[in-house]
Each structure stands twice: as structure tokens, then as C-alpha cells.
């Protein structure tokens, strides 16, 4: 990854599975710290609330609040016995993609959709899949791309 200007990131984490959220957040913070980025963290109840929180942050910036160079979405959706998994997985991904495209956001999507706890932990831990770190590095890469393309707002 190329050297980018100092950046400020908003991490939005869903706390539906607290222990897994902690593991994902650890990976994201480690990646951002290694890159010299600063960040704020907000928590929401579940994955479906993450896009709304990002939209609120954008509205807040328009009104003089904190401005963010990029966003990291962290959450875990584990398949259960109902159709709810499909709704949460599909709609959270769709809403994040809509925001990223319509607002030209540098966004790392770390909302994991898995079949069971074993898959979740294998992806959440920094010592294994490190998907929290991956999402943070994706956001940093997209920030660098925005800067290189002159798409900064």
C-alpha cells in the first residue's frame, strides 16, 4: 500500500456477538495503528444498523461535526434457523455498497456472513483470518485511491 496522508477513520461495530466484535475490533485497530491512522469508534446493536450509523456520520459532518476520510464496518452475521440471516446479510451489504458508490466513500466492509461459530472465530481473530484488519486495510487502500484519483471531497 502506498503512503497516504494522515487519515481519520470511523469504525462502526455491531456488538450483537460481543466476544467476536472484540476480536474484529482488535484487528482493525491494529491495522489502523500500524498505518498511523486515527480513528473513532461507535457501536450499534447489529449489522443492519451499521449503514445508518455511517449515514448519520456523513450528515453530522455536513453540519460541522467530525469528518472522516474513511469508514470500517465490523459485524458478524451467523446463520440461524430462519430467513433472517439472508435479510441481514443481503441488506447490510446492499446498503453499504449503496453508500460507498453514491457518496464515493472509502469503506472497508468487515461484516462477516458465516454458517457457524467455528467459521466466525476463524475469521474474527487477528491471529487467524483477521477480517477486522482486512476491512481496515481495505478502507486505507480506498482512501489512497481517492487521493490518487483526486476524488477527495
Swiss-Prot record:
Q: What is its EC number?
A: 2.5.1.78
Pfam families (alphabetical)? DMRL_synthase
Q: In which pathway does it act?
A: Cofactor biosynthesis; riboflavin biosynthesis; riboflavin from 2-hydroxy-3-oxobutyl phosphate and 5-amino-6-(D-ribitylamino)uracil: step 1/2
**Which residues are recorded as binding (2S)-2-hydroxy-3-oxobutyl phosphate?**
81-82, 123
Judging by the UniProt lineage, the source's domain of life is Bacteria
Q: Which GO terms describe its biological process?
A: riboflavin biosynthetic process
Instruction: Answer yes or no on keyword Transferase.
Output: yes
* Zinc in keyword set: no
What residues form the catalytic site here?
84
UniProtKB keywords: Riboflavin biosynthesis, Transferase
A GO cellular component annotation in the UniProt record: cytosol
Which GO terms fall under molecular function for this chain's record?
6,7-dimethyl-8-ribityllumazine synthase activity
Residues given in the record as 5-amino-6-(D-ribitylamino)uracil binding sites: 16, 47-49, 76-78, 109
Top EC class for this record:
transferase
Q: What does this protein do?
A: Catalyzes the formation of 6,7-dimethyl-8-ribityllumazine by condensation of 5-amino-6-(D-ribitylamino)uracil with 3,4-dihydroxy-2-butanone 4-phosphate. This is the penultimate step in the biosynthesis of riboflavin.
The molecule here is called 6,7-dimethyl-8-ribityllumazine synthase 1
Name its species. Answer: Rhizobium meliloti (strain 1021)
